[in-house]
């Protein structure tokens, strides 16, 4: 079942209690602006954000413009300096699928604890996984480990928002990577933008149970 969702509702729902959500946005390039909009609202309330960028889409100017807009429109009582928001967002970039896995499974859990960052945004998690130079069996196993790590973070009350650009690949097997990732999320939304405005379609909502220890390895062996 699908349903249209206003972007403000989506942002509020993701930020609302209880923490520990797994959301996935996919579609055209507007998924990245929508994610930054969600991040900016969280930063406005003082919530530290960790952003993992696998597709070089982070836009510092968007957040700076957001700060100026909320000040000029008097959405807040005091002037919001862009620097105050930007100093509370931590960026990590991954240029290969191996770096992406290491960032999410090894570095991210300790980092969010150290920085008290309850919200993580990941741009283009799978972009580097589409590189044909990376063996498919390694990519599939890596994705399973990443999914397990995301569920562990959810269990520690960390909310995660994935933003992915829809792609049509020549490899049918690699085309199956994104559906596998999306199916492991609590909610998935398809986002497009046209002359009529932004359209957000809620595609699914499921109650995910955290993966048990060993599930990722067992699933990888079954591929």
Q: What do these predicted ranges mean?
A:
Residues 22-24, 49-51, 88-91, 188-190:
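Conserved beta-strand scaffold positions in the cores of enzyme catalytic domains, especially
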Residues 6, 99, 141-145:
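Soluble or luminal CAZymes and related metallo-dependent hydrolases
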Residues 111-184:
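P-loop NTPase motor core
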Residues 1-69, 81:
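The Walker A/P-loop phosphate-binding site
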Residues 19-21, 46-47, 86, 157, ...:
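Short, well-ordered alpha-helix to beta-strand connector turns
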Residues 16-17, 42-44, 82-84, 111-115, ...:
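Conserved catalytic network of the ASCE P-loop NTPase/AAA+ motor domain
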Residues 52-132:
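Conserved inter-motif catalytic segment of the P-loop NTP-binding fold
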Residues 151-223:
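Phosphate-binding/switch region of NTP-binding enzymes
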């Amino acid at each position: 079942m699908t349903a249209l969702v206003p972007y403000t509702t989506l942002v509020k729902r993701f930020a609302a209690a209880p923490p520990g959500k797994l959301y996935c946005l996919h579609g055209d390039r507007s998924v990245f602006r929508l994610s930054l909009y969600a991040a900016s609202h969280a930063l406005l309330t003082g919530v530290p954000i960790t952003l993992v960028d696998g597709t070089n889409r982070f836009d510092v100017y968007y957040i700076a413009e957001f700060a100026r807009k909320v000040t000029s429109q008097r959405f807040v009582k005091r002037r919001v300096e862009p620097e105050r928001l930007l100093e509370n967002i931590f960026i990590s970039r991954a240029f290969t699928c191996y770096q992406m896995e290491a960032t999410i499974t090894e570095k991210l859990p300790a980092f969010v604890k150290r920085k008290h960052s309850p919200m993580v945004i990941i741009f283009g998690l799978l972009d580097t996984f589409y590189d044909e130079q990376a063996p498919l069996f390694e990519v599939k196993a890596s994705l399973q480990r990443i999914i397990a790590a995301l569920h562990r973070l959810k269990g520690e009350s960390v909310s995660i928002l994935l933003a992915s650009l829809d792609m049509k690949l020549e490899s049918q097997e690699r085309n199956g990577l994104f559906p596998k990732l999306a199916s492991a999320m609590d909610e998935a939304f398809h986002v497009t933008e046209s002359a009529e405005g932004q359209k957000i379609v809620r595609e699914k909502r499921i109650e995910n149970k955290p993966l048990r220890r060993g599930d990722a390895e067992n699933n990888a062996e079954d591929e």
